[in-house]
Amino acid sequence: MENAYAAMLRTIVQGLDVVGDRWALLILREAFYGCNRFEQFRQNTGISRATLTRRLNDLVDNDVLYKRPLGSSKRVEYNFTARGLGLFGASLLAQDLENQWREKGDPESPVTVHTVCQQPFKPKAVCRHCRMELKPEDIQWQRIESGYSELIELGNTGNSRRTRDSHSSKSSRVASLIGDRWTLLILIACFLGTTRFDDFSQQLNIAPGILTERLKSLMSAGLMTRETYSSNPPRYEYTLTPKGHASYTFVIALRQWILEGCRDELPAANMIHGPCGQPLKQEIVCGHCEQKPWPRDVVIKND
């Protein structure tokens, strides 16, 4: 079982390096908005040609997108595979976070409509078993040490390209924050109950300077706050704000998609939905009609 658990951790690490990367999140957002050509992605995201080529190839190699030749030319378009379409719920949650985290001066996000009920689309995360709305306080680990083991593995391994980039007008606040490995891991540590600097440092194996910078970034973005618990020397406890807690369902959506797409047999899920006692399976529905949305049914509202 220990070998199987280690395989699960490696699967999560590898998956986050593909779809949790800042640029990959931007590409997926644009793809769900209807972009499928190289130049469309480049113009809408501001990604350099070399970086865009690498990220698109990664998404193709990992069965998220596939290339379709355009006639007799060398040009291709990029479309979602069946597995890639499974990221639609995560993409909807990311867009909702973008709206919640939007600050003065940020570009306006497109308004989407659910054509089934003709209402502005607002995603709602529910338990697939009991259909109750998921709340962070209702999600439990069967063994909390399993959560910390997963966190440590994520911090110690993975692709080093996941580093923080500056926020640009064509970027996304969600992609800029969650698309950074260390920021994402700090958020996950908070979900597991970590609050103190030394505990973050030990669990994540993160350099103090990097940790300080990321904590400041999270506080500046309004996702985290701190309170003094010792004055000599000054020491602080860091906790998530409601704005920070809002990212929980998005992180779960990425994790769940990665594990459900794995062909190897993995251990049963360690996360439990407390009210019904079932292994956590999150599903995204429309907040108005509570129907599961499909890409064809969520469209950008035209003024």
Residue spans for each PLM region:
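Basic, amphipathic "hinge/linker" alpha-helix immediately C-terminal to the N-terminal HTH DNA-binding motif
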Residues: 20, 71-91, 232-251
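Short, structured motif recognition centered on aromatic/hydrophobic residues
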Residues: 23-26, 65, 87-98, 110-112, ...
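N-terminal helix-turn-helix DNA-binding core of bacterial DNA-binding proteins
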Residues: 10-48, 108, 126, 169-210
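Catalytic cores of eukaryotic secretory-pathway lumenal/extracellular enzymes that build
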Residues: 57, 66, 98-101, 261-262
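C-terminal regulatory/oligomerization modules of transcriptional regulators
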Residues: 99-163, 263-303
